[in-house]
UniProtKB/Swiss-Prot annotation:
Biased composition (Basic and acidic residues): 474-483, 512-521
Transmembrane helix found in the keyword field: yes
Membrane-crossing segments per the record: 17-37, 61-81, 143-163, 266-286, 288-308, 348-368, 384-404
Origin superkingdom: Eukaryota
Calmodulin-binding: annotated segments: 426-447
Major location (coarse): membrane
Domain-related comment: The C-terminus contains a calmodulin-binding domain, which binds calmodulin in a calcium-dependent fashion.
InterPro entries in the cross-refs: Mlo
UniProt-recorded name of the protein: MLO protein homolog 1
Alphabetized PANTHER family for the sequence: MLO PROTEIN HOMOLOG 1, MLO-LIKE PROTEIN 1
Protein localization: Membrane
Summary of the function given for this chain in its UniProt record: May be involved in modulation of pathogen defense and leaf cell death. Activity seems to be regulated by Ca(2+)-dependent calmodulin binding and seems not to require heterotrimeric G proteins.
Record's GO cellular component terms: membrane
Amino acid sequence: MAGGRSGSRELPETPTWAVAVVCAVLVLVSVAMEHGLHNLSHWFRRRQKKAMGDALDKIKAELMLLGFISLLLTVAQAPISKICIPKSAANILLPCKAGQDAIEEEAASDRRSLAGAGGGDYCSKFDGKVALMSAKSMHQLHIFIFVLAVFHVTYCVITMGLGRLKMKKWKKWESQTNSLEYQFAIDPSRFRFTHQTSFVKRHLGSFSSTPGLRWIVAFFRQFFGSVTKVDYLTMRQGFINAHLSQNSKFDFHKYIKRSLEDDFKVVVGISLPLWFVGILVLFLDIHGLGTLIWISFVPLIIVLLVGTKLEMVIMQMAQEIQDRATVIQGAPVVEPSNKYFWFNRPDWVLFFIHLTLFHNAFQMAHFVWTMATPGLKKCFHENIWLSIVEVIVGISLQVLCSYITFPLYALVTQMGSNMKKTIFEEQTMKALMNWRKKAMEKKKVRDADAFLAQMSVDFATPASSRSASPVHLLQDHRARSDDPPSPITVASPPAPEEDIYPVPAAAASRQLLDDPPDRRWMASSSADIADSDFSFSAQR
């Protein structure tokens, strides 16, 4: 066998043990990954994290889509490499500062490598023609798509983790709502001036009241104390007043966590518009434009703008409280409305966050791919310092979006006109099942009590036995024959007898049994519903 072909043996020239070992490793790794995802999905279901289970299903769908793309690239590699285009068309819109000689040298190198592998360059047979994409470039593109999917899922998981970490201290604020101090603060009999409340003083200070400076204050506030205790408690009270009863025991913190999980299953996916954004960035990556440099700052601008807008929403709610009344009763109450958000659409904020995460993952995946692929580092990183700045901006953007903007979004967007009813579906079903179970248990107890009461009535007042008693026979017995006859008179009806054995318990039981059972069951059921505690399950 020739020495030049020793490193490029085909399958018939490869030992069977080598083929078996490689196949076994690939199969075992794939099965382990599939089994791990399956167990993770079951763990989410057991922990009653339906939204996280849906997010995991979305990740599985992304992996399946990635598998389809990989399959298409593998199958279409040979046909695409046979699509020939003129060299003049191949020399425009290049991403690198490479001249015609460098391109031809690289093409010649590709032809030599393909020829050494036992193949040949189909388009080299034609004068002035080159392949649309060579087999090597398609292989590199294949790797980039895989790296992009991995980075996007990783960034979304990091975003969820940092967001939950930021929201941990909100749980302490939620627990304080059961304290006497908080109940005194929201006491309806307590009157205060609106401008003296902590919420209004925080958001309507000297600089916050100036129209031109409000946006500047909101911009810097997102970095320093984006959400405070007074903000959380005020928006919590406004949400409860708008969508629930004021005295309901509602865990607003758990609701926000479930809402964040529900949004996570949207963020973790790569929709068709996002794929088009990625394709557009690849198209605009032309040498001389510096597309990958200046476009890396676009997600940063979007995140800063979104954070500023969310802070402005809080300021607008504080302004409406002050404009509505001079004196407030109890706690200041905000009125949720979609008018605070862009185009009356709170979900647009989530779209911008989704776009930011995808674009940031795209930038980092492109950096890692070009640095790790031989021959691409010199092309895409001519100025290494600009590339380092790009990486620093990407990492800072990820921390800012995950730890500040995403939790702020989860809280402020609850001030929209509508609440997420999909989150309540599971909780409503649980509440109805618990209510049904308690109602059936109480009905069994009532039936047993009614049966015992009926039995006590039967034993305490036996009408048939009393009518056959000798005492009653003696009352109706006629006078003896030796007694003097008495004048015939019309007998008056006997006075009603008093029972010598009064049974007040039996009378009470008789009064209880006089009520229709349906009315008694409905009254008890209505009381159960009114006293029920509609709160989220503590099992997390």
